[in-house]
Amino acid sequence: MDNAALNQETEKLKAKLTAAELPAELKTKAEEMIGRLALMGEGQGYSNEYDRVSQYLNWIVALPWNKATEDRLDLTAARQILDKHHYGMGQVKDRILEYLATMSLTRGKAEAGRAPILCLVGLVGTGKTTFGPSLAEALRRKYVRIPFGGLGSALDLRGQSRLHPDAEPGLIIKALKRAGSNNPVMLLDEIDRVTEGARADIMGVLVELLDPEQNAQFTDHYLDYPFDLSQVLFVATGNNTKNVATAVLDRLEIIQMPSYTDEEKIAIAKQYMLPKVLAESGLSQDNLTIDESIWPKIVRPLGFDAGIRTLERTLDGVAGKIAKEIVGGGSKQFHLTAANIKNYLPDY
């Protein structure tokens, strides 16, 4: 590659950097990287170094350093959205509404309160993970989820140094890029399920993420420059707190998610789940009616279950069998009763 072509490549990098809105120190650092690249000329290793510098620039210009969404602090609208997606969960909803009220009263003031870091703890299927998107919708914030189940290294969260081949940022920075804003609702899902060997290191990163005195200067190893996470609204989930470090628990507001009673499951199935399942199966409410007397059989096909995942699978199975009969030329209206319910329940 001749000098003209080399100069053209580095000028493209400079133009990309100039157009980006970056912290001044980070921009200076990137300019120095481009300057060193230009000095390499046609020397050995130029191609690899160009790829590294170009990839780094692509990452830093894509991050939402100064981009934030504006919060909707309307308590009535927030309550309606939370109720639309979730039955019950009164303690969680009340805590969020309390925080929104505080934000509304302190907006623009020096004493503006920090977001509570909620940790929803409960058995499988009790609605922990689905609360994150609802909260984001209520606030009109972006939503991102980071799964901790099976996470095997703190470097997965914090990234690797650019000295390593194929280095890239960690899950936190990747989530911010996906969000496109610096104040998303970030769900840290199943923080109790990281691998045992990496637990101590991962808990150390969690302390930094969740501590308001530290997260304004969170440094990813790949970026090698601090990113302010203080505006992120973190929500964590876990099946229990046994495997969560005390230092992490100290920074969380633990909310226990109770098991659903049969009565609550029936209400959830009627109000939330059945309309959704019918729509996803291409059916309408005219296609299916269900006798009140058989709902207990639908919500408990295998005995007691704390969550609602089995219930959702059961309704999916019912809808699938009905859809098959309609497409096969059968009736278009079905009424489930004690006499025929066994024909539509899935075979477990």
Task: Set out the residue ranges of the language-model regions.
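Hydrophobic positions in the central parallel beta-sheet of the AAA+
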Residues: L118, M186-L187, A236
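Walker A/P-loop
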Residues: A110-F148, K177-R178, V207, D211
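AAA+/P-loop NTPase substrate/partner-engagement loops
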Residues: A138-E168, A175, T195, E264
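Short loop/turn elements that form and flank the Walker-type P-loop nucleotide-binding site
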Residues: G113-P116, L139, R158, D166, ...
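Extended, charged alpha-helical coiled-coil/arm scaffolds that mediate oligomerization and mechanical coupling
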Residues: M1-T106
